[in-house]
């Protein structure tokens, strides 16, 4: 397992199949595995304007920052896990994703909230940028980003939660044995999946179960 010093300083560090940027200079790693929360980005924390690759398109969803702040108060590790095929499609670069995450981290800080770890996958098999034009297990619904968060934050994935507004998010949760929250108007009838209209609405439910 990586130690905080091995993770290196922000904003970014490459992984063998994905990318990670740290909102905090270093993250505290617990001695024993613990539950964590893996959040999708667009449609969960910020408004999904479609391929958000610049800071001027970052808009917090109402109540999202407050929900994250509550997780922080409960000392529950929080990671962002987001597919960013816009990099592979040539719509924006990896540096642009880092800038968006740095900006998002600052916005959350003004609301007394923080993300412990940002993870994203820039790969897509139909990409036009050769470096990123390939399949990757880091791309949701693959397990790669969840496994990376597990290693970086010393998580117990079986006791952790994945929250997102797409079926890919639920697929990643199922791939690693985590519970899932689906954000949408049509509930998903699948084992260990609960549906809520927003992260803010789901937060008390998650906190109650993590505290058990």
Predicted regions and their residues:
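Asp-based, Mg2+/Mn2+-dependent phosphohydrolase catalytic module
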Residues: 1-37, 94-117, 125-162, 166-212
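Active-site neighborhood of HAD-like aspartate-dependent phosphohydrolases
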Residues: 8-79
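Metal-dependent phosphoesterase signature
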Residues: 45-62, 87-96, 110-113, 129-137
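Short linear capping/connector segments at secondary-structure termini
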Residues: 82-87, 121-125
């Amino acid at each position: 397992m990586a130690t905080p010093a091995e993770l290196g300083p922000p904003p970014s560090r490459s992984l063998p199949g994905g990318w990670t940027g740290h909102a905090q200079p270093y993250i505290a790693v617990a001695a024993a595995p613990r539950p964590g929360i893996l959040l999708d980005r667009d449609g969960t924390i910020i408004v999904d304007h479609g391929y958000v690759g610049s800071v001027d398109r970052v808009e917090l969803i109402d109540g999202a920052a407050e929900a994250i702040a509550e997780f922080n108060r409960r000392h529950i590790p929080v990671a962002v896990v987001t597919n960013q095929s816009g990099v592979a499609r040539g719509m924006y670069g990896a540096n642009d994703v880092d800038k968006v995450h740095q900006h998002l981290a600052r916005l959350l800080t003004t609301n007394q909230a923080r993300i412990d770890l940002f993870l994203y996958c820039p790969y897509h098999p139909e990409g036009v940028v050769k470096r990123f034009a390939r399949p990757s297990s880091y791309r949701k619904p693959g397990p790669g980003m969840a496994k990376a968060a597990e290693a970086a934050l010393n998580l117990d994935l079986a006791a952790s939660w994945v929250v997102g507004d797409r079926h890919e998010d639920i697929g990643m949760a199922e791939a690693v044995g985590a519970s899932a929250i689906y954000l949408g108007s049509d509930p998903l009838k699948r084992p260990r999946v609960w549906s809520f209209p927003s992260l803010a609405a789901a937060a008390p439910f998650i906190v109650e179960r993590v505290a058990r």
